[in-house]
A protein has these predicted regions:
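Short polybasic amphipathic segments
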Residues: 126-132
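C-terminal accessory extensions/subdomains outside the catalytic/core fold
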Residues: 134-139
């Protein structure tokens, strides 16, 4: 479905295994040539990308610390157990360095952002999520699938 709407779509394990190296190459190329055109990279399953591409923690840091300088914006999806409770270096890096997080759960139930004054929040409806920037929380209403 999405393959017709995006410029590059990686949908198989074979393609996934090389995409990390391709992204690093693109960042290096852009840094060298001074290219900074906007490019949104959506990674719906970070756990799969890490396991299939064998990205190291250093490579991941390079991607996130240099990608924004050349116009590359990463939107990462993953299950909560990977980033919220994972003890491996890559989920820990993500946990401490992501700028924005979207939760479809009570803020009190998550373990990696400050819970602040949200200790009494209820379970959000299925069409509500929290957008958290580490400084503020915004409640967003999203559309429901029918």
């Amino acid at each position: 479905v999405y393959s017709e709407l995006v410029k590059t779509y990686v949908g198989s394990k074979n393609e996934l295994s090389d995409i990390g190296n391709q992204l690093i190459y693109e960042i290096e190329r852009r840094l060298e040539k001074g290219i900074s055109s906007e490019w949104i990279i959506f990674i719906p399953n970070m756990r799969a990308l890490v396991s299939e591409s064998n990205l190291s923690e250093q490579q991941l840091q390079f991607m996130f610390e240099n990608g924004y300088r050349v116009g590359m914006r990463f939107i990462i999806g993953t299950d909560y157990t990977y980033i919220g409770t994972g003890i491996d270096p890559i989920p820990r890096y993500l946990k401490t360095n992501v700028q924005w997080v979207i939760f479809g759960m009570r803020l009190m139930d998550q373990t990696f952002l400050d819970k602040g004054m949200y200790s009494r929040d209820g379970v959000p409806n299925s069409d509500l999520v929290y957008l958290h920037s580490r400084k503020e929380v915004i409640k967003l209403k999203i559309s429901k699938n029918k």
